[in-house]
Amino acid sequence: MAAGHGHEHGHEHGHGHGKMELPDYRQWKIEGTPLETVQKKLAARGLRDPWARNEAWRYMGGFAGNITFPSVILKGFKWGFAAFVVALGAEYFLDSQNGDKKHH
């Protein structure tokens, strides 16, 4: 195969694949999270978890909310109820259209 016709590794082919930008690792802090307690307990035994920071994202931002039984049960209720109302309206509308045809 001639040069430039195959999929050579390391070259961009215009598909929008560029270098992926990773977030700065220093933004993730374990201070004030349950991971800090784990690190302290490990330190008391002379140990340390060097990868704890990789789990810190779980305790920050939108991921940090408490999970409760009602939140699990009601998750998606708003969109589910909206879909139910749309389906009910469509069913009512289609039934009324068919009802008109039956009487004529």
UniProtKB/Swiss-Prot annotation:
Disulfide bonds: none annotated. The modification Pros-methylhistidine is found at H11, H13, H15. Belongs to the complex I NDUFB3 subunit family. Accessory subunit of the mitochondrial membrane respiratory chain NADH dehydrogenase (Complex I), that is believed not to be involved in catalysis. Complex I functions in the transfer of electrons from NADH to the respiratory chain. The immediate electron acceptor for the enzyme is believed to be ubiquinone. This is NADH dehydrogenase [ubiquinone] 1 beta subcomplex subunit 3. InterPro entries: NDUFB3. It is a single-pass membrane protein. The chain crosses the membrane at residues 72-90. One of its GO terms (biological process) is electron transport chain. The modification N-acetylalanine is found at A2. The modification N6-acetyllysine is found at K29, K40. It comes from Mus musculus. GO terms for cellular component: mitochondrial inner membrane; mitochondrion; respiratory chain complex I. Complex I is composed of 45 different subunits. The modification N6-succinyllysine is found at K29, K40. Its main location: mitochondrion. Keywords: Acetylation, Electron transport, Membrane, Methylation, Mitochondrion, Mitochondrion inner membrane, Respiratory chain, Transmembrane, Transmembrane helix, Transport. Residues 1-20 are annotated as: Disordered. It is found in: Mitochondrion inner membrane.
